[in-house]
Amino acid sequence: MTLIYVPTTLNLIDSFNYSESIYKWGDYFFRHLESRDFYFSNFGFISLFLLLFVIPTITLTTLGCFLFSYLRFTDINKIKIQIYSLLTVFIFIDVFGLVVSVLFGYLLPLAFDSLPFSVNLTREVFLSLAMIVIFANSVIFTLRQKRNID
């Protein structure tokens, strides 16, 4: 999920030319992200883990908690199941995104010298399908839990 959000956000910022420094940072980061050694270097792993897993998960979960409690005008204790399912979905999508990114960005090009398909396109298709399936499952799970609470 966040593997799709971060590049899309940087591309949108770049398309509107808001800041030259943000563009240079994004270009530098994704140039190093495409190199195969970046995944297994200490800096690369820590920055990927922080940027694509820890920070978005904490931010989205916190925003989701406040949004749920504000929209439903209830205290946080009544919606713990929805918050836990939301957190589980974010963590699963982030872990899946990192695994797919390493698989299609590093291991698959090592196995084949020339691939008959675009690695980036295939990765985005798999991530999009996984996001749709996981989001649908989380919605169904949340609705079932809500029915059990009511």
UniProtKB/Swiss-Prot annotation:
The chain crosses the membrane at residues 48-68, 89-109, 123-143. Signal peptide: none annotated. Its main location: membrane. GO terms for cellular component: plasma membrane. The keyword Transmembrane helix applies. It is found in: Cell membrane. Keywords: Cell membrane, Membrane, Transmembrane, Transmembrane helix. It is a multi-pass membrane protein. To M.pneumoniae MPN_085 central region. This is Uncharacterized protein MPN_087. It comes from Mycoplasma pneumoniae (strain ATCC 29342 / M129 / Subtype 1) (Mycoplasmoides pneumoniae). The lineage of its organism: Bacteria, Bacillati, Mycoplasmatota, Mycoplasmoidales, Mycoplasmoidaceae.
